[in-house]
Curated annotation (Swiss-Prot):
It comes from Oryza sativa subsp. japonica (Rice). GO terms for cellular component: cytoplasm; cytosol. ATP binds at G89, D110, K133, N156, N191. The active site is at C257. InterPro entries: D-isomer_DH_CS1, ThiF/MoeB/HesA, ThiF_NAD_FAD-bd, Ubiquitin-activating_enz. This is Ubiquitin-like modifier-activating enzyme 5. The lineage of its organism: Eukaryota, Viridiplantae, Streptophyta, Embryophyta, Tracheophyta.
Amino acid sequence: MDEEQLRALLRDLDALKQRPDPAAIDRMRERVAGMVTPAAAARSKIKDMSSEVVDSNPYSRLMALQRMGIVDNYERIRDYSIAIVGIGGVGSVAAEMLTRCGIGRLLLYDYDTVELANMNRLFFRPDQVGMTKTDAAVQTLSGINPDVTLESYSLNITTVKGFETFLGSLKARSSDGRNTGVDLVLSCVDNYEARMVVNQACNELGQTWMESGVSEDAVSGHIQLLVPGETACFACAPPLVVASGVDERTLKREGVCAASLPTTMGVVAGLLVQNALKYLLKFGQVSPYLGYNSLKDYFPTMEMKPNPQCSNPACVQRQKEYMQSKPARDAAAKAKMEAEASAADECPVHLDNDWNISVVDDSDTVTPSILSTGADSLPEGLVRELPTADSYQEPVAPVTSGAIDDDLEELQRQLDALNSS
């Protein structure tokens, strides 16, 4: 129901006040009036991002990254599509962050519904209990930023039908017709079966994705970048539960659940989205793997190479394709480096800027310590304890062992002469 419909309803209620019981109608009118306020507060869509620093511009702080030289063109973020699988503690927060960043298109996947037990996860509200997580996410995210295109899929990707729908949606054209496929997949699921399904889909499509997870004790987590053929897939070095073939659902016990801290979820979601932004907007260093241990504030990193004997045929095929294209990539990288080096030689040492900061070539200056003397660098009445560079004397050569032997012989003769007398 839009704002105009609500106002029409208010007019109808005003007309009904002629009835005998106006109190009930007044209460109804107050409830509807409360619905009009948020409807009026929702902003309209913004066509172009602006760097103008005004209170009414929701993108001014984001565009400042471009002005400060962190990102070349931040507005490119509107051209990208990201799929988030799992709208739980990490996925829902990641979706909110990307929405606030102004991502162009978000695809949301989950089959679960919102429960009161989810209220510690920073995102869902008690009034959304009973809604599917995807619908609840769309409801909240569309209010935060109406510029983002949101597509929700309430399905279980581990089923045959769900996997087919998931695979097709990753390749399909967006609802507005602007994008085809997705640029990145974020896995925020809480079980290994779903991770293996995401791994299979991305290997088949050659789709880059990032995996995330939080430990059962809620005090540690990780994120990982997976590029089919270039890095290890999830099946190249599977966890023990996956490698042993045990159905992880049989490991769960009645009345026992994993711990969940909103702080850890928020940290992992932040690391995940930060890595995604660096990957898409080409700034900083994209982490291949980054762990997080909150007990020791420890952030381990590592790289994982693909396993040539991986059990996933699609992964092995992507590895072959990656190796076949390696000479062309190396040649392109070399040409790019040479072009950048040539451009650097032609450009000035520094560009004009608003802060009057200049970069001075060290070769054009002389170190002040070489020009200064011992007298001009100290106040009157003070002298240097150590010699200056101009008055430095070569150290006395050490006495050789032969001279020491001669002195000992002379001393012995003197002692013998004294004893004889």
